[in-house]
Amino acid sequence: MTNAQLFLNNSWADKSETMSGSGSTLANTKAVREHLPLLLEKYNIESMFDAPCGDGNWIQHVDLTCAYTGGDLVQKFVDANPLQSVVFDITLGTFPAVDLWMCRACLYHLSNVEIQLAIDNFKQSNIKYALITSHTGNSGGDIRTGSFRVLNLEEHNYFGLDAPIDQIPDVLFNNMQENLLLFVNPRITK
């Protein structure tokens, strides 16, 4: 089964509001919707690539001050997204030329091998920043793609990322805080 098929068969989705899962409801994205525009302004972000973007349920309600493109494995999500989006695989695709890659609520559903592929793909791109979801708890072990585990990207220098330079709060889910950590691409100098 391909990753697209795994995520298309999303039994976890909150189908009353979004096909992208309960983490993409307006209630669960309140903090990120408030803090994301401030971060974009602080770092002079003029363009962003949101991958995976899901169906765009929450991002369409953000006051974006930059050019936006979404990318997702699932054609159905891309078609449903009211903002510009394309079919894209973060582990294989060539990232577009943008200032920021936002990877929200994704990596903790991927195996360690696929996470490393996505991070390496980012590091080989010309994107300056990556904004990636991380938990505050202790990381769980490796999983099969499509499952879930706690993933703390600040723990044990996971996947060769340098320490994050900033963060914004995301959602408190099952008594566990999720934040979006801002990383600088080591290939790009300031």
Regions inferred by a protein language model and the residue ranges of each:
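Hydrophobic adenine-recognition pocket in adenosine-nucleotide-binding enzymes
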Residues: 106
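A conserved beta-strand element that flanks and buttresses the S-adenosyl-L-methionine
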Residues: 102
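Class I (Rossmann-like) S-adenosyl-L-methionine-dependent methyltransferase catalytic domain
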Residues: 1-97, 110-190
